[in-house]
Amino acid sequence: MTVAIDYFLLVGFCFAVTSGLWIGLKSIKLI
């Protein structure tokens, strides 16, 4: 169970980082 929770948190963290970088690039292109 703990392994599944750690894997879920890792995937969520990576998704948050990639989405943040994508939003940052989009905002830079809009400027």
Curated annotation (Swiss-Prot):
GO molecular function annotations of the record: electron transporter, transferring electrons within cytochrome b6/f complex of photosystem II activity
Keywords of the record: Chloroplast, Electron transport, Membrane, Photosynthesis, Plastid, Thylakoid, Transmembrane, Transmembrane helix, Transport
Main location: plastid
Protein name in UniProt: Cytochrome b6-f complex subunit 6
Native species: Phaeodactylum tricornutum (strain CCAP 1055/1)
Superkingdom of the organism of origin: Eukaryota
GO biological process: one example: photosynthesis
Gene Ontology cellular-component terms listed: chloroplast thylakoid membrane; cytochrome b6f complex
Record carries keyword Kinase: no
HAMAP family linked to this entry: Cytb6_f_PetL (MF_00433)
Bilayer disposition of the protein: Single-pass membrane protein
InterPro entries with a match to the protein in the record: Cyt_b6/f_cplx_su6
Listed transmembrane segments: 3-23
Family designation: Belongs to the PetL family.
Pfam families membership: PetL (PF05115)
